[in-house]
């Protein structure tokens, strides 16, 4: 007696799940799943039936790209979403489900992104104002430490939310943070003395010294699940960090386009302007390719620094 024939639709769904599970990063898997479900909704397809993706053609992908652009999404975000879709279809090709990749750049062009990226950076003066904005109460002490870590390490917001108390340690003469980046890659980032001072003050205020596995930055007691010392024993969410940063930006009347990601751009730009080598910056930022690092560096006063002014004949 032979078993029942495999269900082709279930096999297709399993291929999609296998593609999604390739990334060791939970944040990446969540973002990829969101992008895929967004495309399925655009196509009028049920998220529980991704096997219907075999009907997708290049003109469908182009229409989705145009809809995203009309909705005001940035070119870099659209490119990222199209890259996700292209990756899925390429993976499905290896399973024999797709004849061609309908999201391939040979068929659908992604919008161009200027080399000087879209995220707004801060001047050193405005960054200083932001660092000094939080008050001196316990929540303000946390915010002062959090903003200092962002500004002095250039870490991503997702990396910040994964920091642990135990990952703040002494290595030789350096105070460092163990940062877990994309793909679960770990790197040690030295802390600037001002950031060390603020983190020390926060650890004492939150009574978390010695909690090796506990999250370094935590939501206040007013948030759901607050702990006995005024802060919950769980990490802050990415959105909470974003709201916190944007709140101080509004209070200071800074450029409304400044986001939490602006602190990463500011750190890399300022370090480059003050002589840091691009390879050192690449390691500092946790980038796999130095060309990615270059897209984070903003050109301040570009015209004044033009090579035209150093020419002599």
Predicted regions and their residues:
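Conserved catalytic core of the tyrosine transesterase superfamily
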Residues: 1-313
């Amino acid at each position: 007696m032979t078993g029942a024939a495999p269900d082709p639709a279930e096999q297709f769904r399993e291929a999609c799940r296998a593609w999604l599970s390739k990334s060791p990063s939970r944040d990446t898997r969540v973002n990829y799943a969101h992008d895929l479900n967004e495309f399925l909704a655009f196509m009028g397809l049920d998220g529980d039936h991704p096997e219907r993706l075999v009907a997708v053609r290049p003109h469908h992908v182009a229409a989705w790209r145009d809809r995203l652009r009309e909705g005001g999404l940035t070119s870099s975000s659209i490119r990222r979403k199209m890259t996700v879709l292209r990756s899925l279809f390429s993976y499905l090709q290896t399973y024999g489900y797709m004849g061609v990749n309908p999201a391939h750049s040979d068929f659908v062009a992604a919008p161009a992104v200027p080399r000087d990226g879209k995220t707004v950076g801060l001047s050193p003066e405005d960054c200083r104002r932001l660092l000094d904005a939080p008050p001196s109460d316990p929540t303000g002490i946390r915010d002062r430490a959090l903003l200092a870590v962002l500004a002095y390490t250039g870490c991503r917001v997702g990396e910040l939310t994964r920091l642990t108390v135990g990952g703040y340690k002494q290595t030789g003469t350096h105070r460092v943070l163990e940062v877990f980046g994309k793909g679960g890659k770990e790197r040690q980032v030295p802390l600037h003395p001002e950031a060390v001072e603020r983190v020390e003050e926060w650890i004492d205020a939150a009574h978390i010294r010695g909690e090796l596995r506990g999250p370094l930055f935590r939501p206040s007691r007013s948030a759901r699940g607050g702990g006995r010392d005024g802060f919950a024993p769980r990490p802050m969410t990415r959105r909470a960090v974003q709201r916190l940063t944007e709140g101080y930006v509004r209070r200071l009347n800074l450029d409304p386009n400044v986001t939490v990601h602006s602190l990463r751009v500011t750190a890399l730009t300022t370090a480059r302007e003050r002589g840091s080598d691009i390879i050192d910056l690449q390691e500092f930022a946790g980038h796999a390719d130095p060309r990615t690092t270059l897209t984070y560096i903003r050109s301040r006063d570009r015209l004044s620094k033009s090579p035209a002014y150093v020419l002599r004949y």
